[in-house]
């Protein structure tokens, strides 16, 4: 994956770096009635079926995947069954820092499936991979309010330092990479209204439950699908499970990427009219 890596001499009192990106966003909508020939690099598909440090595919992950997909025959059936399983068994936990850690084995073993998008969509991706369905997390950033009236599915463009969001994709024969986001279903159920919605058939949740199986709203920018990263020049040992927040270190150690005001980073977006 591509990234910006900057280093500053110890004599620089107030190091500063600014990055400007110009992107075009679009809604992703799948037409389930239309099938087409789709070719993908076998290396990409193998990567989307592989285990990572926090997404093992054996043990409790495989057992859970088998339970969730019991009776499902096609990859579409498996993806739909896992999507519904995640919504039925997991929940959004507002107290989770950042977007979560994505440690699905620990979550499944503990029985506590509460977390945020990097946890909840990671469960979806891990169960899909364990079922033989290529899937991947897509790490990115919301950049604008939702056009569909859901406050929890949008962001304040002027201040995006807490707008990071992970989505998911599955590769399905006849359709290619298809958008998914069970984590946002659970976010709406937990936070869109004062009461915690427990039933995805609720009038507020039902459109999101149906809409986010195969679709994404284009108020979001995807950065990468990488796992287990070795960042250049990183002093702290080990890998980064995913890359969605700015990372920084100095002689005293690593900065807290989930505390932008202490780290001192800001993110903003401006819509450019065509």
Placement of each model-derived feature along the sequence:
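Generic alpha-helical propensity signal that fires on short helical segments
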Residues: 33-43, 100, 104, 151-155, ...
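Hydrophobic/aromatic-rich core segments of domains that either
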Residues: 122-235
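Low-complexity, Gly/Ser/Thr/Pro-rich intrinsically disordered linker/tail segments
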Residues: 207-274
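A surface-exposed beta-strand-loop module
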Residues: 1-20
């Amino acid at each position: 994956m591509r990234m910006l890596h900057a280093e500053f001499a110890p004599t620089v009192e107030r190091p500063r770096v600014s990055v400007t990106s110009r992107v075009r966003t679009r809604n992703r909508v799948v037409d389930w009635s239309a099938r087409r020939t789709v070719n993908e690099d076998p290396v990409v598909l193998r990567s989307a079926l592989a285990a990572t440090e926090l997404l093992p595919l054996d043990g409790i992950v495989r057992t859970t995947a088998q339970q969730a997909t019991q009776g499902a025959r096609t990859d579409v059936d498996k993806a739909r069954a896992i999507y519904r399983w995640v919504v039925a068994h997991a929940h959004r936990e507002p107290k989770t820092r950042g977007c979560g850690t994505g440690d699905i084995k620990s979550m499944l073993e503990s029985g506590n499936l509460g977390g945020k998008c990097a946890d909840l969509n990671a469960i979806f991706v891990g169960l899909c991979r364990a079922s033989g369905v290529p899937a991947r997390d897509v790490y990115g950033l919301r950049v604008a309010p939702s056009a569909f009236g859901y406050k929890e599915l949008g962001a304040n463009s002027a201040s995006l330092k807490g707008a990071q969001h992970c989505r998911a994709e599955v590769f399905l024969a006849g359709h290619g990479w298809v958008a998914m986001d069970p984590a946002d279903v659970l976010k709406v159920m937990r936070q869109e209204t004062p009461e915690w919605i427990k039933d995805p058939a609720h009038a507020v949740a039902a459109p999101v439950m149906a809409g986010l199986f195969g679709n994404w709203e284009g108020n979001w920018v995807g950065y990468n699908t990488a796992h287990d990263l070795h960042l250049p020049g990183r002093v702290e040992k080990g890998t980064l499970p995913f890359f969605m927040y700015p990372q920084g270190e100095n002689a005293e150690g690593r900065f807290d990427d989930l505390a932008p005001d202490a780290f001192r980073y800001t993110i903003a977006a401006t819509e450019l009219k065509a």
